[in-house]
Amino acid sequence: MAEEKLLVKRDGEFCYPIYFENDFSFLSQALTDEGLAGKSMCIVSDSTVAPLYADQVKAELLKVTDHVYQFTFPAGEAHKNLDTVQDLFQCLIENGLDRKSLVVALGGGVTGDLSGFGAAAYLRGIDFIQIPTTLLAQVDSSVGGKTGVDFRQFKNMVGAFHQPRLVYMNMATLQSLPEREFGCGMGEILKTGLICDKDFFDFVCANYKVIRTMDPEMLAVMIRKCCAIKAGVVERDPKEQGERALLNLGHTIGHAVEKLMNFNLLHGQCVGIGLGAAAAISRERGLLTNGEYEQICHSLKLYGLPLYVEGLSPRDILAATKKDKKMEQGQIKFILMDGLGKSFIDKTVSDQELLVGIHAICR
């Protein structure tokens, strides 16, 4: 693929580029172009991704620096915590990384969140870059500068806004994704269309057969469009003071389910379940027709996402929902849909309405 990139802005000024490639061969040039050559670098990856791609990435980094280190942690959301961050700090300290060094996040959303938070906190903040290898990370967690880790049973409770210096997407890494992981990314993509772009939502639904074959050209079109939509939202509201909160559609109840399931369901699966709950509440308010509600549920099924969760008490889900980190003065900032492709923030969703959504997803 010829070099393609999307420029993400903040306050109208250039912030960082997102590179779209089909291999790692342009990474060294991208680092040079962004003024990152010569830095000491530490690749952060998990035990699943490191054996697949760490050597390839290290070879590219060694073209622009003599000092490349590696930190690998056990894969899974259960290790996205302060204990792993402490281990990362120990690695950075032992290898002498300083304020001019660079953290290289290689992997999915867990790796990106953890690496970014570690970079934000280490020596009061050092540079980092994102090399997302899952669809979920490419379209969601690698764009926007949100970083963080889970604290005990509370998801993303400790974190910081820390923008990467660049994002480098090798879309060929998607070909190694298990189908379940691919579906998780599609949940976030469907969410993006439902928030603010009905045409994009319709496109993703209409082309599901080609998309599910992981056709490279179709994936490239879809990923670039999704990143452009999210980047636009982030540019206008980098620290989630308003519009950016819309990106949390499906996440409030979704995070509660994820926590109660002890992370045995993947994040994207829980977001899909949360989308169904938000759609049910929106329908209850008369904001979605029955047909639109069914269309949302059908879109999730097209990509193999679960619509229901088993074995959880609706009251337990409600209690967990009300511990969401986005609570403000005892009120949930809930995202509702007003038709397909339009959403808004609502602070008046009652417990009774929440239970309507929760009962819609419980079996």
Language model feature labels by segment:
Residues 110-117, 138, 256:
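Short glycine/serine/threonine-rich phosphate/pyrophosphate-binding segments
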Residues 62, 94, 163-166, 172-179, ...:
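Generic secondary-structure signature for well-ordered alpha-helical cores
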Residues 2-7, 187-189, 287-363:
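C-terminal charged capping/lid subdomain of soluble metabolic enzymes
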Residues 89-106, 115-130:
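Non-catalytic interfacial helical region
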Residues 117-210:
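A glycine/threonine-rich phosphate-anchoring loop and its flanking beta-alpha core
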Residues 1-101:
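ATP/NTP phosphate-donor binding region
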Residues 207-315:
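Active-site segments that bind and position negatively charged phosphate/pyrophosphate groups
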